[in-house]
Amino acid sequence: LLCCAGIMGGVFAGTISDHLFQSRRGPVAAVLYGLMLVGAVVLTFTYEQPYVGWLMIIMSMAVIGVHGMLSGTASMDFGGTKNVGIAVGIIDGFVYLGTAVMSFTYALVLPGEQLDAAGKIVGPATDPANWRPWPLAMIPLAALGLILSTRVWNAKPKGKKA
């Protein structure tokens, strides 16, 4: 399902970039960060509702879509053909740095996994209330991404010379 969400996120990002925002990447990133932000806020208060699965699919689509938009196409746009490698390296480096920071954050705030003799998860990890820090940790980062993506709202890739 995550693979499908990723494919849909990439197609959605590319479609709205090309057809709605005239190939500008900033507005697409802003829309996707906005989806992440709204999703995290809604998830914080409704994490026990049955529609949370669909919300997670939409949020996964936004996360993977913005990653593809920023590390793929935007790096080519802003790095140019001669510097695209360094642009991708810098952007992806920050992606993995952010992933590492969030992994340590989640390890500190989320419940540890405990298994019974049959290998079934038991203990604090089974209580949905103990998972509230997960969307709460996403809110400030999605807001930061939204704010920063609005800074490049009007940036457009340079056309090729004929």
Feature map (PLM): residue ranges:
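Cytoplasmic membrane-interface "Motif A"-like loop-to-helix N-cap segments
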Residues: 18-33
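Intracellular juxtamembrane helix-capping segments at the cytosolic ends
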Residues: 65-80
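A late C-terminal transmembrane helix in Major Facilitator Superfamily
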Residues: 81-115
